UniProtKB/Swiss-Prot annotation:
One cellular-component annotation, GO: cytoplasm
Protein name, UniProt field: Small ribosomal subunit protein bS16
Listed GO MF terms: structural constituent of ribosome
GO BP, one annotated term: translation
Pfam families, A to Z: Ribosomal_S16
InterPro entries referenced in this protein's UniProt entry, alphabetically: Ribosomal_bS16, Ribosomal_bS16_CS, Ribosomal_bS16_dom_sf
Coiled-coil regions, chain positions: none
This protein's record includes keyword Ribosomal protein: yes
Protein keywords: Ribonucleoprotein, Ribosomal protein
Keyword Ribonucleoprotein attached: yes
Naturally occurring in which organism (per UniProt): Desulfotalea psychrophila (strain LSv54 / DSM 12343)
Family statement: Belongs to the bacterial ribosomal protein bS16 family.
């Protein structure tokens, strides 16, 4: 089972809000996930990225790989701190 850190879409039509979740790579985009490690709200100005660093490091230590989109969000979040 390959585990990925990726985005799941929430919100309503034309008003997206995303969760950063840890999920099996074969699960559906908005399907079953293992843990929530953060949120991303692109509709705010500037966009709001909230990450639980403790959970994130725990999952990365276990071998979870972030998607390219999540990697770029993590870089932006680190730059804003």
């Amino acid at each position: 089972m390959a585990v990925r850190i990726r985005l799941t879409r929430l919100g309503r039509k034309k008003m997206p809000f995303y969760r950063l979740v840890v999920a099996d790579s074969e699960a559906k985009r908005d399907g079953k996930f293992l843990d929530i490690v953060g949120t991303y709200d692109p509709m705010q100005d500037p966009a709001v990225i909230t990450i639980n660093d403790e959970k994130l490091q725990d999952w990365v230590g276990r071998g979870a790989l972030p998607t390219t989109t999540v990697k770029s969000l993590l870089k932006k979040a680190a730059a804003n701190k």
